[in-house]
Amino acid sequence: MRILVTGGTGFTGKALVRRLLNDGHDVVALDYKEGIKTEELRRWGAAVVIASVTDTDAVRSAIDGVEVVHHLAAAFRELDVPNTYYQEINVGGTRNVLELARAAGVRRFVYCSTCGVHGNVANPPADEDAPITPADYYQQTKYEAEPLVKSFESEAMKTVILRPAAIYGPGDPERFGMIFRRVAKGSFPIFGSGQVFYHPLYIDNLVDALAAVTNDGVGDGGTYLIADEEYVTIENLVTRVAKAMDREVKTPHLPFWPLWLAGHIFEKVCQPLRITPPIFPRRVDWYRQNRAFDISRAQKEIGFHPAVGLDEGLRATARWYQQEDYL
């Protein structure tokens, strides 16, 4: 089967491309810039198209002969772009790919949204019908594209929406890198109680879900939260990262609000200069917002059963960070 993966060089995209190739599919990966990762995808056997999802001619060419689209490409919390950029890529780009997919006779369209559309979960765990309260333009525009995707659902082209939790694992130095690096230093300051919930999602588990909904009749027209079996408190997560690294870690508790104020000040100062602030509000919110989800719908309807548990995933991630000298 010929499959298009947009955002093919991203953390999730790259892992999905490899899985689909290993499963015997013919894969086209679309991404907006050339680099080491695109060369790696070519070595694996994927066709690579360098273009934005807003480039109609390039996407039309990439989608020719494709049966299934996995739409993963997104503008993800870019510091030095206007908010209209999120609208252009996450909503406009999605519309462009949808329209071209329908015109090309694509029979399945899988849209990768985010659990972040639910914002701070008031009564954890949240299911798919919990309130939609996005906290930033990334989350807002990812949600705005969801009804757009549903509007293209038809007998000819089935759609599926996945809302992944906090993705981590070997192959990505950023998402959990901060946690591992601080633990490696032996001290992880916790601002606030440390008792808010956080819901990890190991990369292989997410790829299993994406591979499942590639198949006809799996999840047609549905929206699914995708996360690991277990959600944990921030403090417990830090402790288990330390265990995975075979390290001792101190977790001193500090007041939250001074950090929150500093985050807003740094963002205001750094944004006009187009530099990344050392602290910013989204990262500060990690210490105070609940992120915990009910995955029972995905378990029942698409057969999603996370194969890799938290401790196993953390150990594998720790080994990769150490091998790649990120710690």
Where does each model-flagged region fall?
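Conserved Rossmann-fold NAD(P)-dependent oxidoreductase catalytic core, especially the SDR/UDP-sugar
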Residues: R95-Y138, V160
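Mid/C-terminal beta-alpha module of Rossmann-like enzyme folds, strongest
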Residues: D216-P278, I295, D311, R315-A316
